[in-house]
């Protein structure tokens, strides 16, 4: 399966890229599994495991780590939004 991953804000700064097309191995079928796969790269990729990091699938916020991903999906990675 191949997905298009977009990185925003601190995720973009940490990993040093704005986007990539990623071939994911079998078994990576959810947002949580994709996050773990990316974090396994080590080093700056660990920022994606931070509490509050959010994911969107095809421009809709993923409801949780168990949200399924599919071939060709656009996955956005961004920090939690806060305000006041």
Where does each model-flagged region fall?
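Ubiquitin-like/PB1-type beta-grasp interaction modules and other compact soluble beta-rich domains
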Residues: 1-83
């Amino acid at each position: 399966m191949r997905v298009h991953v977009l990185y925003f804000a601190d995720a973009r700064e940490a990993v040093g890229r704005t986007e990539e097309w990623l071939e994911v191995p079998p078994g990576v079928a959810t947002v949580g599994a994709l996050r773990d796969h990316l974090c396994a790269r080590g080093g700056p990729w660990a920022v994606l495991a931070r509490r509050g990091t959010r994911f969107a699938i095809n421009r809709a916020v993923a409801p949780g780590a168990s949200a399924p991903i599919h071939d060709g999906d656009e996955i956005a990675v961004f920090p939690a939004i806060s305000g006041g």
